[in-house]
Amino acid sequence: MKPLNIIFAGTPDFAAQHLQALLQSQHNVLAVYTQPDKPAGRGQTLRASAVKILAEKHHIPVYQPKSLRKVEVQENLSKLNADVMVVVAYGLILPLAVLQTFPLGCLNVHGSLLPRWRGAAPIQRAIWAGDKKTGVTIMQMNEGLDTGDMLHKVCCDITPTETSTSLYTKLANIAPKALLEVLDGLEQSLFKAEVQDESLSNYAEKLSKEEAKLDWSLSAEQLERCIRAFNPWPMSYFVTQDSQGTLQTLKVYQASVLPHQDKPCGTILAADKRGIQVATANGVLNLEQLQPAGKKPMSARDLLNSRADWFKIGQVL
């Protein structure tokens, strides 16, 4: 088993953790591709990606093309003479010319048990849908969206209190090891490629702020999953009205499900030390930790101590 010469393509912290694992392995990272620096923060100063920061720390050449479709970009990639390209949350489409550049192909690390969730938000959609388990798939890339042949899968449970933040951490802990196992056996074809079953695929649509608004016509169970799935972004929220008639927006960090009461959806049933209880299509959603605009997250009890007028019994949200 000889060391492989690798081009790594990735952008966020999740990708950087895989790059770190490669740097600590027997394999050679020849170069890194990552998205261009982007404005961030109040000052909108350009900020480098987590992958770029790590690569520069280890004196690895960094390339940041806006697209991989240009011929000169593809020629530069080919001149690096790598055995394989490893892609983790890169954010750019790989055209066929790039996919055909490397003798051992392009490997992708995807945060779901394919073909269950293809697309941009597999971690969040697994929680949103109520899946009991998820995992990571290492696949050989093709021109489709997460449709390539699967080489290796590793699983993990989704707990009843799992948020996207905690699940992201779980997957980041198990995925790099799975990637290295595949790379170590790639030349010997130790992992048999498995074609995905199209009938089992779902599209993990990108999250939006609009979707994050709590829809009381859904069930309490669905809403509780949304709250966990949309944490840390875009954060589930709802709007209420104070005694002056001013609209107040609150993000929800934690909630639980209580037995159903036959009241119109969105009706505030109770507001006490246990939480703020709201009727839904099926079951009651008990809001336990919330964040008013401009404030830190707080318990329902603490919020009610100062803002009880925001939550009148019988009020419909």
From Swiss-Prot:
Catalysed reaction, written as an equation: L-methionyl-tRNA(fMet) + (6R)-10-formyltetrahydrofolate = N-formyl-L-methionyl-tRNA(fMet) + (6S)-5,6,7,8-tetrahydrofolate + H(+)
Signal peptide from the UniProt entry: none
Swiss-Prot/TrEMBL keywords: Protein biosynthesis, Transferase
PROSITE patterns membership: GART (PS00373)
Taxonomy, superkingdom: Bacteria
Family statement drawn from the similarity comment of this UniProt entry: Belongs to the Fmt family.
Name of the protein in question: Methionyl-tRNA formyltransferase
